[in-house]
Amino acid sequence: MRLLTQGEQRRRFFHQTRINSAGAGDPNVSFHLIVIPIRSKWEIIPFSRIFAMFESFGFEETTAKEASVLLAALIGLAFGVLAQRTRFCFRRSLVGEDRRQALGVWLTALALAVIGTQAAVAAGWINFDAHRFMASEVPFLAIAIGGLLFGAGMVLTRGCISRLTVLTGGGNLRAALVVLVFAVVAHATLKGVLAPLRVALGSVTVDMGESVSLATLPGGALVWGGLIAVAALAYALRSGNRPGQLVMAALIGLLVPAAWVGTGYILLDEFDPIAMESLSFTSPSADTLFWTIASSSIPAGFGTGLLGGVFVGALVASLIAREFQWQSFDAPRQTGRYLTGAAMMGVGGVLAGGCTLGAGLSGVPTLSVAAIEAIVMIALGGLTMQALLSRSSAANGAGSTTRQVQPAE
């Protein structure tokens, strides 16, 4: 007996459900019902002409993973445009000269991400029970060290990895080199020569049992999610930003639940399961690097589509705004600083379980204790490195009234 290919299984499924939905072949039935599996439950959904259109375009041949690449590209495109216009960056919100406004933008996005994600959970569309954020064995040591490294690295490179990806689309060659080195080091930490370090640090865990989420605390997800969202919005509304900036920041935040729901609900496929993912740059950067050099052997995934979309979106936005400009390094010392920061972020992002987006903007809305620890340690690492740089700059510039100029990112 020959085993059916995935495409044949999908075509047979659609054909059978169409027969079943047409009222057992009754020619008088004009309003079809299609039976599809959603979260392992069979639900009857009205379909009619939409089904015919879906089939006519040959979408029944499209796998869930292929569809996730398109979804990620669209989400990445939107993020690239919005992040370029708002200068969205966690580093700026910590140590930038305009950190009050930058933090207001970041917290607005976080608030909407929390509201949207928890609303999707409450609606039963998604849940994070099996997600790595909710693993009972939490590698606190790896997260702490990784967060500190990533935070320090993003200060050295004057931008978190999401910001640097956006800057790459605007012609910044410094950012492009950092993104490349970051991807190489992240991949080496995941699967290469630095993997033993990751495994060793990751083996030091604390068993949190069921207390891996704020949702398990008194008050539950509604109270804790609400507190985070309200506190974030309260600060954002007093941050001095123009309403337009906050609206764009809110749209960035809504991309997080859009990705969670897209991969965890809309594209849920019993025949072709995919991981539930959202905005993140660490693992996607490593995956994109590997796909770039071996695309004939491995298919693109959500992360590859996301990064491609971000780059294109940032490029288009910078061209429309006439802000595209080629930029490079000014001196070898500056190059060394950026490469060091890139390597630190590559190792740190993997150990921490994500970057400022993966662990922060996407992770915190899940109410995961591990994600919250990661973003707190990233912030601490960034503030510590900035303090060290300021002290060094003050010592080197003693007796001089001229402030050392640094490249504005």
Regions found by a protein language model. Name each.
Residues 44-409:
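Membrane-interfacial helix-loop segments of redox and metal-homeostasis proteins
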Residues 2, 10-12, 18, 39, ...:
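Basic polycationic patches enriched in arginine
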Residues 8-12, 28-30, 43-44, 49, ...:
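N-terminal leader/targeting segments
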Residues 16, 29, 33-35:
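Short hydrophobic alpha-helical segments enriched in small aliphatic residues
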Residues 4, 16, 400-401:
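Intrinsically disordered/low-complexity terminal segments and short unstructured peptides
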Residues 24-26:
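Intrinsic low-complexity, disordered N-terminal segments enriched in polar/charged/small residues
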Residues 3-4, 33:
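Leucine-biased recognition of intrinsically disordered, low-complexity hydrophobic segments
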Residues 7-10, 17, 42-44, 405-407:
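Intrinsic disorder/low-complexity segments enriched in polar/small residues
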